[in-house]
Structure formats: structure tokens, C-alpha cells
């Protein structure tokens, strides 16, 4: 009896201490908490690794693995779909077992392993390396975003600005990795230094180096996070957790680690054969939705309405990413086949590097500015609500794809068109993305109960998985059926597809803005 009482007293003191520590973190002064900067740099280097490899995939598959263009588009969509689908699984294990910190660290180790395998022999071990990266990203990505959300109280108006800054960190990494990795692989960067037969090895090896920097950054700054991200088996702020309850639970953590390694051969097989991806995507979505509905039964009607609103955002984000992610598929091949290498008439650059990096550069420039604009508008009570912001994102995307389509009118007889207009389209894409993606990360944390935040963040990225999957299908449909088609014929095929996407994006934006009053009611007090 006395032992239990002492244990309860110790638990109460621990909870009180953790609550005070969290309160201190959330009551920061200024625009951003210092912990945001630590997570910013860790995420920046991880995104260098991720986007560096993402930018190489389609080009590498066509020119090094000698896949057909439509096959490479489908393969790209399948690979990226698995990457984002596993963010849901990673969020689930983080919520229930590992906690955000351990999940992030384990994911980082797996990503480093995958990059090193690809650096050793990217042609022979392509799918093995990609499989490690798929699983690693699933454990890493949703959890660092959730920890950013935990730095803020639910009603803190600075949250959107914080996520916008964090998003610019993502894009600094994407800019550097997106341009550097593929340019090294193609020999456009350090071509005179790196031997031709080792260029792709070095490109993938660079991804491993920067991922290691990301992990080291997190390890040396994680203490500043206080109770944020601790395992739910140990976190004193988790309801029902006591010292007695956590005893003997370590096997669950070890089982998670071992299980994630055991599924590598399964993932390798499924990623290599896109028909398996089809079945996976047919199953994972309905199963995830059923699981969420089950979890929703545990909450009040008010919380259920908020989660329903979150699902509306998730559905429309699938459509958005299906269009946006042409950047890694059809637009990558369009850049390789149909763009000149002159920017602003004088600068000679790699068109694929521009395709991978232009959007990120524009986000770096405009994300902080847009965050400040949202704050300025909020203070004057003229800020558009979150649903309208989403709708505006689609309208910008529609305009961008019309510009991609319009590049056909600047092409020469050989089918080579203007890199300047292509880059202009990415500027417009950026405004669309900034209306949706950083706000989307923020709204998931605002609409979700604490116990479901990891799962809902995972669902947000699962929506990206379906978007990536659809992007591969859309990109494959744009490819000319004649593999020996000229550059001019490929130009017509791709730009016809971009015109269709422009129309679809316009319709989606108008519909979303039209239903915004209904969605706002579901969101309750959340803005």
C-alpha cells in the first residue's frame, strides 16, 4: 500500500514537472521558439537527402536502368506512394510505442543505410536501397512535423508562421539536394572531378552524408524539447502511464525495430512490381479510413466534426499532389527532352536541376514573407480562412499548368522550348503550394486530439501517397505511345496533358471555395 502511494506521488511530481516544462516551451517570446530552429536544421538536411534522391529517380530509371518512359513514370509514382504510405505507419508506431524522438532516430538510420546501399552500386541494388529509404522516411517524416506542432498551444496565432518557416527549411534542403544530386549524377556538376563511372555513386553517397548530419543535429539538440516526443510508454503526460505500467514494455520497441527490418524484402518486391503497388493502394486507404472511424468513436461529437473537416482537407490534398508531383515524373522527362539550358538568356544551367530546385528556391524566398502576411492580415481580421487558402492553392496550380502548356508556343522546330517560361510556371506553382502545404501541416495538428496527432499527420502524408500514385498514372498517360517519338512529338503529348490538369485544378479550386462555409462549421472554433 505504502509503495503504491509513493509511486503515485512520484508520478504526480513527474507529471507536474513535465507540464511546467512544456508550458515554459510554449510560452516563448518573439515569433519563433528556439526549438523550432533545431528541428528546422534537422529537417533541412533530411530533405536534402530525400529530395536529392527523388529528383534522380525518373531520370536514373530511364537513362541508367533503361526503362521506358511510361514505365518509369509508373515506377516513380509507386516508389513515392510507398514512401508516403509508410509515413502513416510510422506515425502509428510513434503514437503507440516509440514516441516521436525514437521513431525519428530509427528512421534516420534506415535512410542512411538505404543511401549507402545505393552509393555502393545504384544499378544492382536500386530497389534494395530504395526500400530502406521508404521505411526510413515513414518513421522520420511525420514525427518531426508533429513535434513542431507541439511547440505551440492550440490557440497560438503564431503557429501558421512557424510552420511556414519550418516549410522553408524543408525547401532549403530540397533546393540544395534537388539540384546537386542529379547534376553530379549527370556530370553537370563536378564533372571534371568525379570519374564518369562513379558519378551516380557519388550522387547517392552525398545523400547519405547529409542524412548523417541531420541525425547528429537532432541528437545534440533533442534535450531542449523537454517532454515533447517522448515514448507514450514513458511520457508522464500520456494518460494512464505510470512507472509500473512501463515495466516489461521494451519488447514492443524491439519488435518494432526488428519488424521494420523484416519487411524490407517485402517492400523491395512490391516497389519493383507496380501491380503490387496497385493492390497495396487499394487496401491501405480503406483500412486506414476504417481505423480512423474506429478511433473517432472514442471522441465527442465536437471532436468528430473536427476530424471530419480534416478528412475534407486530406481528400482535396490527394488531388493537389497528383498534379503537383508531376515535378518528379513527367516534368522531369519534359525537362530532359524539351528544355534549353539558358536561364534569363545568359545563365547556363541543368534543366533537370531547375526542375528539381526552382520550386524550392521560390519557397525559401516567399514562405517567410507569406507567413508574415498571414499574421498582418490576422491582426486586421481580414485573413482568408483555411478552406479558402486551400482553394486559392488550386487556382494558382491551374494557372501554373496552363503556363506549362503554353511553353509549346515558344518551342523551336526541334521541340526545344523556353526554360524561362518553365521556371515562371514553377513560381506560380510555389504560390499554390504555399497556400496549401504548410497550412495543411498546421491544420492537421489543430483539428486532431493529442492522442491522434501522429496518426492524422500520417494520414496527411498518406494522402500524398495517393497523390504520388495518381501522379505516376497521369504522367504515364501523357507519354507518347511511340517510344521513338521525336522531341517535338513528346512536347505536344506532354503539354496536352498539362492543359487537362489545368482545367481539373480550376474545377477543384472553385468547388472547394464554394463549400468553404460548410467545412468552416465542421472546424468549430479552429481557424
Feature names for model-found ranges:
Residues 1-34, 154, 182-332, 336-343, ...:
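Intracellular loop-helix junctions on the cytosolic face of multi-pass helical membrane proteins
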Residues 83, 158-186, 203-214, 258-261, ...:
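Glycine-rich segments within core transmembrane alpha-helices of 12-TM secondary carriers
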Residues 53-73, 186, 327-353:
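Short amphipathic helix-loop junctions that connect adjacent transmembrane helices
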Residues 77-94, 141, 175-177, 357-372:
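Central cavity-lining transmembrane alpha-helices of secondary-active solute carriers
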Residues 109-127, 391-414:
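C-terminal ends and interior cores of transmembrane alpha-helices
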Residues 44, 114, 125-140, 314, ...:
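Hydrophobic core of transmembrane alpha-helices in multi-pass small-molecule transporters
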Residues 96-108, 303, 376-395:
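Cytoplasmic membrane-interface "Motif A"-like loop-to-helix N-cap segments
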Residues 87-123:
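Conserved MFS/SLC helix-loop-helix module at the cytosolic interface between two early adjacent transmembrane helices
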